[in-house]
Amino acid sequence: MPTQLFTTTDDVVLTGRHWVRTDAPRAAVVLVHGFTASANDPAVCDVAEALHADGVDVVCYDARGHGTSEGHSTLGDLERHDVAAAVEAARERNDRVVLVGASMGAIAALRYAAHADGLAGIVSVSCPAQWRLPRNVQGVLAAGLTRTRVGRAVASRWMGVQVAPRWTNPEPPIGLVPRVQAPVAFLHGAADRFVPTSDAAELYEVAGEPRRLRIVSDMGHAFAPQSVPAIRDAVDWALAVEVRA
């Protein structure tokens, strides 16, 4: 699949990949990875290849501050501009675009969708409802990496992620979802140790119709082999229902 460069409206250059169908695609999917991931991660590629086999074009990219893209990660805030650039690229071949985002990527997708029209659907995977972290090892690690100077240095040196120096405290997903004017499916792993399944239920409760909630029994956090069948099914569902007026 060819490499592609996207430039966001705030002048950040992103490195992307485009899985292009040789026949006429039935839609396009923009795949938005989570924190510390990239477009080249095996789990991300597994999702992209499965969706591509289902008859859609797939656009994926390294979010700002990740992989070979420019900029600094803001954990789903300014990443809305990344999503916008990828959607624009996807629409060069197909107007029907579904966003599939995981964790930080789901936050970015919902933030973009709350102010956008014309999406065919959104699949939100492992998305938090509020800005709260679990009181376990995973929560302490996430807080340390993103909210302390030492943690940001560790993320840069050992994980290749450039984190913005300050947390912007943007509106949480629970406030964004009611403004989304597209079919939205919430997927969550029952074995997720970062974000509890109750967050998915909270987001589902405030979403408009059409909406869908699925808890996957053997799935953990974000993109993983166990999430692929559920994501494929959710994309099919989104494309089968009518977009709300």
Show which residues each predicted segment covers.
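The serine-hydrolase catalytic nucleophile loop
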Residues: 36-49
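Conserved alpha/beta-hydrolase "acid-adjacent" motif
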Residues: 193-199
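Catalytic nucleophile-loop/oxyanion-hole region of alpha/beta-hydrolase
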Residues: 64-93
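Hydrolase active-site cap/lid region
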Residues: 115-166, 176
